[in-house]
């Protein structure tokens, strides 16, 4: 995932044909299967003398919020500096979106509490799913990530506080709103998820960082149970990422050992340790003091340790490719 394609995003107010361009992909509200009866271009021009467009504006805003998160997911594949810049742009757009939503939804008296409760439930589920689509970034991206999550929470709060005051008294219209929300949530569920929840994406792979501790053999088994392997390192960038992440937790098992033959280091897939990774051993390691046959991330490098000791571990498996259509 090292391609340098830059994510490009147009301001919401200046988009033509209701489209967003991201990393060479075109996201079109008009071409989507989610088609509110009123277009996005009505946002700036619709006034209070039509009830339905106001509600469809709400749906459009929700859909745009979803698109912003898809854009955020796309720009996560770009280098760190560019990724951070694009995330900051998305945060600004999302802030403006929240402000616009607040000013567009009128406050008046509404009825039909049963249908409003169903709509509220759909909004809450939609918001939860949107938040689940945000990749978990490390280091410098954490603050911007928190801001985006905060903006979405504020957006949900505004929606829930005003859902009871929608100027829609016709039961059939409220039913249409409910069906639109159900359809939006269904479409959102279909969005590609590269990694399972609680896993971290990097360079086309998914990584699971354990919260409990096991001995080396049990860690190998734990990874197999989730159709993964105790982590095998294939690049310097991957090594740096894993070393930094594990350093904060403490000694962490990797999928390397010399259990089969002393001083012959093999990964769990049977491949030998490349000479270019020898530089990652801590000073004086491996020293095989007391039959230390399994390798851990320790401090700033690698250390051989006793396999029966309990430590954290990292599982790795290939990310699920997104299918088109």
Swiss-Prot record:
Gene3D superfamilies per the UniProt record, alphabetical: Mannose-Binding Protein A, subunit A
Compartment(s): Membrane
Membrane topology: Single-pass type II membrane protein
Cytoplasmic side: 1-52
GO molecular function, one term: D-mannose binding
Transmembrane segments: 53-73
Chain residues that bind Ca(2+): 285, 287, 289, 292, 303-304
Sugar-modified residues: 112, 141, 303
UniProt cross-references to InterPro entries, sorted A to Z: C-type_lectin-like, C-type_lectin-like/link_sf, C-type_lectin/snaclec_domain, C-type_lectin_CS, CD209-like_CTLD, CTDL_fold
Extracellular topological segments: 74-325
Note: In vitro, is a receptor for HIV-1, HIV-2 and SIV, but does not transmit virus to permissive T-cells under the conditions tested.
Function: Probable pathogen-recognition receptor. May mediate the endocytosis of pathogens which are subsequently degraded in lysosomal compartments. May recognize in a calcium-dependent manner high mannose N-linked oligosaccharides in a variety of pathogen antigens. Is a receptor for ICAM3, probably by binding to mannose-like carbohydrates.
UniProt protein name: CD209 antigen-like protein B
């Amino acid at each position: 995932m090292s391609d340098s394609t830059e994510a490009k995003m147009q301001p919401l107010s200046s988009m033509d044909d209701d489209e967003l361009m991201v990393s060479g992909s075109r996201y079109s509200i008009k071409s989507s299967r989610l088609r509110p009866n009123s277009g996005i271009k009505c946002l700036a021009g619709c006034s209070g003398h039509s009830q339905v467009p106001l509600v469809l504006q709400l749906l459009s805003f929700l859909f745009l919020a979803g698109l912003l998160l898809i854009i955020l997911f796309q720009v996560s594949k770009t280098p760190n500096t560019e990724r951070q810049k694009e995330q900051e742009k998305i945060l600004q757009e999302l802030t403006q979106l929240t402000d616009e939503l607040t000013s567009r939804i009128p406050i008046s008296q509404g009825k039909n509490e049963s249908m409003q409760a169903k709509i509220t439930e759909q909004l809450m589920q939609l918001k939860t799913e949107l938040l689940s689509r945000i990749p978990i970034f490390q280091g410098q991206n954490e603050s911007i990530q928190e801001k985006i999550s905060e903006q979405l929470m504020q957006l949900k709060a505004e929606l829930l506080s005003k859902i009871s005051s929608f100027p829609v008294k016709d039961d059939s219209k409220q039913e249409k709103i409910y069906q639109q929300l159900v359809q939006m949530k269904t479409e959102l569920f279909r969005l590609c998820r590269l990694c399972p929840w609680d896993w971290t994406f990097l360079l086309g792979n998914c990584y699971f960082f354990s919260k409990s501790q096991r001995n080396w053999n049990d860690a190998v088994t734990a990874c197999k149970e989730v159709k993964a392997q105790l982590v095998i390192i294939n690049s310097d960038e991957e090594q740096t990422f894993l070393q930094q992440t594990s350093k904060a937790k403490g000694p962490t098992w990797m999928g390397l050992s010399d259990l089969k033959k002393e001083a012959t280091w093999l990964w769990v897939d049977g491949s030998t340790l490349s000479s270019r990774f020898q530089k990652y051993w801590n000073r004086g390691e491996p020293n095989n003091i007391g039959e230390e046959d399994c390798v851990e991330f320790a401090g700033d490098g690698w250390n051989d340790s006793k396999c029966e000791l309990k430590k954290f571990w990292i599982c790795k498996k290939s990310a699920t490719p997104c299918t088109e259509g």
